[in-house]
């Protein structure tokens, strides 16, 4: 076990526990908020444990310590966390601070994306109702602020207001889209085909996923509500929810606001 400490500007320390293995590769699991990243990370934790691969959840560790994405992503010594034999996961924003590093460039990476219109609708319900409030720190104060803002807006008002921020998130991933080491999964393709998705991710990372393991993971992770649950974390998984929650005019306006990167990923935005 190795401990890596990053001195933060506020005088604190971001501490990560790593288990390097020079004989195994570095792996990355990347995502976008409200696009199935929590489910992907849980599945990967199960797969990684079965395959003896340590998982480093950098964003989660940072969040619990009170640090947000800009705090760690821009850290000049972020590269020090990279060790062979680890899966780096938990990302809902692009770790651009690592993009130039050879260890990142050559690492196998998966990226899970979702129709941005559905992601924004999902984000509204999470912000307004289902996010568990964390400890009172800078990160927690931001979530509390977003909840207050969401509760004062309609779904449509919220998604139109937040579209620019989601564009920013996906545009930061754009430099990776031609990366030969990147495998892209679309939420719409995998949410109702989880066994195949589990096997695909395992195979890409060089892991095994026998039928018994896939069955165990499915028993734990295959949560599909029979009806919408607005205040629950797993609210509604079926694609196309934006068509039920937004007006035709709202969808047209949102389509016009969304980044070309979404079209590059294969989403038809009209």
Give the ranges of each region predicted by the language model.
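Active-site cofactor/cluster-binding pocket
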Residues: 148
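The conserved 3'-phosphoadenosine-5'-phosphosulfate
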Residues: 54-72, 178-248, 252, 256
């Amino acid at each position: 076990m190795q401990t890596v400490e990053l001195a933060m500007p506020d005088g604190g320390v971001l501490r990560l526990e790593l288990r390097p293995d020079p004989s195994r590769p570095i792996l990355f699991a990347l995502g976008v908020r409200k696009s199935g990243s929590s489910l992907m990370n849980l599945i990967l934790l199960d797969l990684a444990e079965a395959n003896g691969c340590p998982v480093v959840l950098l964003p989660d560790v940072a969040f619990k310590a009170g640090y947000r994405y800009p705090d760690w992503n821009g850290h000049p010594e972020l590269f020090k966390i990279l060790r062979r034999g680890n899966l780096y996961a938990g990302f809902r924003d692009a770790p651009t601070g690592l993009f130039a590093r050879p260890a990142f460039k050559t690492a196998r990476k998966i990226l899970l994306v979702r129709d941005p219109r559905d992601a924004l609708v999902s984000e509204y319900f999470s912000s307004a109702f289902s996010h568990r409030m964390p400890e009172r720190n800078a990160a927690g104060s931001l979530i509390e602020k977003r909840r207050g803002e969401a509760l004062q807006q309609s779904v449509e008002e919220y998604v139109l207001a937040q579209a620019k921020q989601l564009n920013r998130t996906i545009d930061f991933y754009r430099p990776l889209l031609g990366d030969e080491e990147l495998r892209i999964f679309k939420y719409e393709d995998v949410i109702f085909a989880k066994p195949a998705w589990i096997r695909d991710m395992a195979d890409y990372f060089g892991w095994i996923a026998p039928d018994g393991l896939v069955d165990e993971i499915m028993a734990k992770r295959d949560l599909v509500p029979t009806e919408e649950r607005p205040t629950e974390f797993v609210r509604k998984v079926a694609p196309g929810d934006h068509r039920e929650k937004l007006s035709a005019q709202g969808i047209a306006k949102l389509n016009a606001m969304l980044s070309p990167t979404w079209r590059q990923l294969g989403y038809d935005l009209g």
